[in-house]
A protein has these predicted regions:
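Acidic carboxylate motifs that coordinate Ca2+ or other divalent cations, activating on Asp/Glu
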Residues: 107
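A structural feature that tracks compact, well-ordered secondary-structure segments
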Residues: 99-103
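An alpha-helical repeat/solenoid feature that recognizes helix-turn-helix modules
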Residues: 1-95, 111-150
């Protein structure tokens, strides 16, 4: 309704979209619903972590390093999980889901690849070691997201 088009850097969308997603669905205003949809579509156009003008390249290398807690930063794991939780199932999510699958270690766990250790009183987990939080989120993505079938016409 006369609102300006969404112009925002995709890496700034993660924290904002997370905040809007925290609002229970029945309590989301029409404006919040539209904002979620616009933000999700922008991320999907980027295949969640790619450059929009070159989908063969990662937009930001840090997006492919899974971390916990994310705070103001984000990564492909957090974004794909967020979109799944919001009910999105789109073939443009497949690369991110496959990235998650590819990072699984032989023992079935995922490593903490990025961390804010040193920024808190206590370190959550050790970088380079198996992470219960990354593993939990990755398993949720693989269980709930799966690979979305691409429709052929």
């Amino acid at each position: 309704e006369g609102a300006a088009p969404l112009v925002v850097a995709p890496d700034a969308l993660g924290p904002g979209l997370k905040a809007f997603a925290a609002i229970p669905a029945p309590r989301r205003s029409v404006a919040v619903q539209r904002t979620i949809a616009a933000g999700a579509e922008l991320l999907l156009r980027h295949h969640l972590f790619k450059q929009i003008h070159n989908l063969g390249r990662v937009a930001k290398p840090g997006w492919t390093r899974f971390g916990f807690p994310r705070m103001y930063q984000t990564d492909a794991l957090e974004i794909v999980l967020l979109l799944i939780e919001l009910g999105y199932r789109d073939p443009r999510m497949n690369e991110a889901i496959e990235l998650v699958r590819s990072r699984r270690c032989p023992d079935g766990r995922w490593l903490l690849q990025d961390t804010l250790n040193g920024s808190f009183l206590v370190d959550v987990e050790q970088k380079g070691e198996p992470s219960k939080w990354i593993t939990l989120n990755a398993l949720r993505v693989l269980q709930d997201g799966g690979l979305v079938a691409v429709e052929r016409s």
